[in-house]
Amino acid sequence: MANKREFPLDKTRNIGIMAHIDAGKTTTTERILYYTGKIHKIGETHEGDSQMDWMDEEKERGITITSAATTAQWKDYRINIIDTPGHVDFTIEVERSLRVLDGAVTVLDAQAGVEPQTENVWRQAETYGVPRIVFVNKMDKIGADFDKSVKSLHERLNANAHAVQMPIGSADTFEGVIDLINMVADVYDEDKLGSKWDTIPVPDEYKEEALKRRNELIEAVADVDDGIMDKYLGGEEISNDELKAAIRKATLNLEFFPVYAGSAFKNKGVQMMLDGVIDYLPSPLDVKPYVAHDPKTGDEVELMADDKKPFAALAFKIATDPFVGRLTFIRVYTGSLQSGSYVLNASKNARERVGRLLQMHANSRTEIPEVFSGDIAGAIGLKNTTTGDSLTDPDHPLILESLQVPDPVIQVSVEPKSKADRDKMDVALQKLTEEDPTFRAETNPETGQTLISGMGELHLDIMVERMKREFNVEATIGEPQVAYRETFTKEAKAQGKFVRQSGGKGQYGDVWIDFTPNEEGKGYEFEDAIVGGVVPREFIPSVDQGLQEAMKNGVLAGYPLIDVKAKLYDGSYHEVDSSEAAFKVAASLALRNAAAKAGAVILEPIMKVQVTTPEEYLGDVMGSITARRGSMEGMEDRAGAKVINSFVPLSEMFGYATTLRSSTQGRGTFTMVFDHYSPTPKSIQAEIIKKRGGEDAE
């Protein structure tokens, strides 16, 4: 028997809550769950019992790491909430959740306005075309400034954001909001945890200001809507419904961002923002079709939410759940799926059986018989599916483009304390790398040492912590190492010739390769320019393979060689002695021989670092950035503090948190995010080579 869909598609919202760390994102999500009847006790992040932050590490650090997907109900709408992390080290989680949600709420701290990580997540949301509304949170704090926060959206994000509300009071006197569309005031009763409020006419002392702001709002909407513009210029009355419809249309087109005010912690304004989610954010029917590819023909296929079409979904997160084991979070784009049925993992071309389907609520779950298009659910039983895989109807395979995964920039060695720990660690690392594609683990074949790499120190700290807590692995952690790279800066032609004659079958491979630098980020490219069969067809893939393998260990200090083009243009072979293996070796010799002539350099990751400090410490802070080989990119003022933008090599940033704390008496903060690779200065390059050589020579 077919199961019935509980909420129609137009009454479904898939949203993310995006913010800078500490802007109050988890508290905001908590309140949404509380007011939509999903939790009965409010948890505070800073007390460590928030409902969304369900991994122990998150509880300890009071930050949100994993995007848990939660289902809530507001009025007669279903809202699926993807909780996204606010810390830079977890940007992949944010990217991943942006892929599967249709709209987002950006939470700002009313004291700080737009902060560095807000800029990062905002840019990512632009990339994925996600419509947003903005919630200016923490209006109860001293120094809260709603207007300045709205202004920061224009100045720092170039966003056409406009208030649809005006706060009544701020800091201690913040008691509610005025709705500029319906021209009413929502005033809260302190004692009722925000679940009770009175909607009253706009108080007299706010009337004039509210009308002025309403007029500004209408003008802003008129700029993006011709219908409203015509009425406005003609002096005609614009109804509330017309205004809301125009705001919705412009918001869905990414031309307008409605701004709300509130205090999640003090339980004010969250319900009105929820109304905004329903009024202005898209349902799965409003978003532009999702583009997939037919693996057989390569043709593009547009997916619109429709339960009757063949099933297609994206696996966007793998989590290891203490109760049910391996849990795969999926977003369904078309069709429906019943528990117990088979799907095709089109990315791996393998059939998988879905055991059970769960609707997730932060850390409790409800089993459901079927999941429909536009929905988000957890699936149990998918053994081979990893993040970014496409799950489809076995008769209609499709590839839903996979996520772009950034390369890790930092590495540490992990040494298990005992043989038993070694076995447990292997299992732990396999599980953790499955869950998080930006986390890598590899064993150095020469030293037998295990190296883990990730997006920052916090990222690796948390992974090590999880190994200990979830898998009982006791391990010693080495000093963080930078993920250096190597590249060529000049063109160089070189021969690689491998000849071995010693009784029986010999070995013979001979190649001439022209190496040229490739554009940054383009990686390795191989070109076959052999004419007249001087290197037989069957050996050419071996040359390509030999180069790729040799490039993994670089030419200077054993770091991967990147961004190089290699053109195979000449060579020779021996009728009897030539083999694939011989040409592989010949290719690696050509690479070695080219290194000296090609101006090989070591590249280091350069981080975009933003430091916020009270003005009195500015000199010290700037001095410490310069001392770390940093280059200043500019400065701005923010809420009585100075914000310094700079680029600093990652190798110089270890331990910076401690330095900054002591030089600003704990008042300075910084964020850093990987920006680009750049050649290291000669002296530092020599040091790195010496250090690596010293290790290799032991």
Curated annotation (Swiss-Prot):
Annotated GO molecular function terms are: GTP binding; GTPase activity; translation elongation factor activity
User: InterPro entries, per this entry?
Assistant: EF-G-like_DII, EFG_II, EFG_III, EFG_III/V, EFG_IV, EFG_V, EFG_V-like, G_TR_CS
Asked if GTP-binding is a keyword of the record, the answer is yes
Primary residence: cytoplasm
The question of whether GTP-binding is a record keyword is answered with yes
Alphabetical list of SMART domains matching this protein: EFG_C, EFG_IV
Q: List residues of the tr-type G domain.
A: 10-285
Q: Which family does it belong to?
A: Belongs to the TRAFAC class translation factor GTPase superfamily. Classic translation factor GTPase family. EF-G/EF-2 subfamily.
Protein name as annotated? Elongation factor G
The species this protein was found in:
Lactobacillus gasseri (strain ATCC 33323 / DSM 20243 / BCRC 14619 / CIP 102991 / JCM 1131 / KCTC 3163 / NCIMB 11718 / NCTC 13722 / AM63)
